[in-house]
Amino acid sequence: MAWIQINTTVSEALAEPLSDAFMEVNAASVTFADAKDQPIFEPEIGTTPIWSQTKVIGLFDAEADIPAVINQLATLIPDVPAERYNIEALEDKDWIRAWMDQFQPMQFGSRLWIVPSWCDTPDPKAVNLMLDPGMAFGTGTHPTTALCLTWLDQNPPTDLTVIDYGCGSGVLALAAEKLGAKHVKGTDIDPQAIIASQQNADRNNANIEFKLVKEFQSEPVDLLIANILAGPLKALAPEFIRLMKPNATLILSGLLTNQAADLIAFYQQQGFEFLAQNDLDEWSQLSFTKQVTS
């Protein structure tokens, strides 16, 4: 089936209204893309990340009356006149197969792999997580997830108790369990994350408990991993302290490299010893130890 793509770049204030307008004129799908290849602005907890200049893309059947669609869009969103919309014809091909072909097994460290379900495992003797790429939650492709997975491979949590705080897809909890952790729990504020994490755990025969934050309970653990954003990482410091044993390890990621120094200083003020910083692209992962208080 052939498709027509209509796109334009708008401010963050217009991105959601334009998405709604696309759906009102019967777009088959609407997606957002970063128009400037910039880091995501950090949102408040519970809000959707969006870029200052966002490319909004609507997909339409090739039989659609595209000029009429654009005129309708211009009427619905007067701040975006008809001449600002770009039209692109997409070739007729198996888009599901094309999407699947983008993803190949990914290696983290020396023995940890994430393998899409339609791919063969490159190394059957390695630690292989069967995980399909998704639109909503991290499955290894983002630098912050990659940094945490590499850290786990290099520092296997053998016989340790672990919490994955802000679990998303559950990939970090899965990696910890498969790398020898004694007991692993995961939590997130998003119900869809809990569902996705549990499905991924079941697919990998992993015994992991996932709960919403408001329902989450745990004894203090040996290792806590939080791959979220810098603002929530600060706000959650008291909760992390409560959930960690003395001398436990804390792994923080989800922050931009230019936010690292401030977060390091903040956690040192909370009584943590800073151990190391690892960077990838514009993102960072930080390691701390919870110091014993006298």
Swiss-Prot record:
It is an enzyme of class 2 (transferase). One of its GO terms (molecular function) is protein-lysine N-methyltransferase activity. The keyword Transferase applies. InterPro entries: Ribosomal_L11_MeTrfase_PrmA, Ribosomal_PrmA_MeTrfase, SAM-dependent_MTases_sf. GO terms for cellular component: cytosol. It holds the Pfam family PrmA. It is found in: Cytoplasm. S-adenosyl-L-methionine binds at residues 145, 166, 188, 227. The keyword Cell inner membrane does not apply. It catalyses: L-lysyl-[protein] + 3 S-adenosyl-L-methionine = N(6),N(6),N(6)-trimethyl-L-lysyl-[protein] + 3 S-adenosyl-L-homocysteine + 3 H(+). Its EC number is 2.1.1.-. One of its GO terms (biological process) is methylation. Keywords: Cytoplasm, Methyltransferase, S-adenosyl-L-methionine, Transferase. Belongs to the methyltransferase superfamily. PrmA family. Methylates ribosomal protein L11. This is Ribosomal protein L11 methyltransferase. It comes from Hydrogenovibrio crunogenus (strain DSM 25203 / XCL-2) (Thiomicrospira crunogena). The lineage of its organism: Bacteria, Pseudomonadati, Pseudomonadota, Gammaproteobacteria, Thiotrichales.
